[in-house]
Amino acid sequence: MAEYYNYSHEQMFDLLETLHDKYNREEFIEADPISIPHSFTDNRDREIAGFFAATIAWGNRKAIVRSARRMMECMDFAPYDFITNATDADIEPLRSYVYRTFNGDDFVDFVRAAQSVCRRYGTFGELFESSFERHGDMAAVLSHVRREFFATEHNYRCEKHFSSIDKGAACKRLNMYLRWFVRRDNRGVDFGSWNRIPMSALYLPLDVHSGNVSRELGLLSRRQNDWKATVEVTKTLRKFSADDPVRYDFALFGAGVNSK
């Protein structure tokens, strides 16, 4: 992709838009973690399913999707009902679950934390949307949501599976989750159900892959994949689409595919 580095603004815009149009399509849902919340029609189920799928979204995508489906099976394919009504006896069998470093004890702690969120806020959407209305800044939202999630007693070990913006993490999985539920278009991929958060407030879900592609395209100079890099690349993408910068998450994925 070296030939793209010296593209003009107009050329880069055309490239990003072309790749966005190619990859922001329903046929790519099945192989992506977003397929897990797409398995449900009730938005409350989608929010829970999406949160747990995003939580384990690192590594091979096929393995992520397969393991996230196992999570849904553990919840009897009724995630919101499970989270709101499960007893200790219902939750204990989750300890047999393992996906890479996310083990059964982590799963139990996350389910109990999710139960607390739903008791206090009703839904995950209400937690995120009310937090944005209160703070008006997505960085503050990510910090507040994490504190609220771990407000109840839990095993400290599980905290590593919920990125901390206060420690400078890129928060890729949280930003991906936010993209799923905040972005609104007519493509049928993202849900766009959280209307109280503007798309312009979103940040790119930055990881090793999208970071490398962003650098190759000349969109990012910072070497570390941390929150500062997330801010930098999103600021650059806002020059191409101020109202919807994270639309180019699809483009960066596509650019990586094309470079292989």
Residue locations for each model-derived region?
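HhH-family (HhH-GPD) DNA N-glycosylase catalytic core used in base-excision repair
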Residues: 1-260
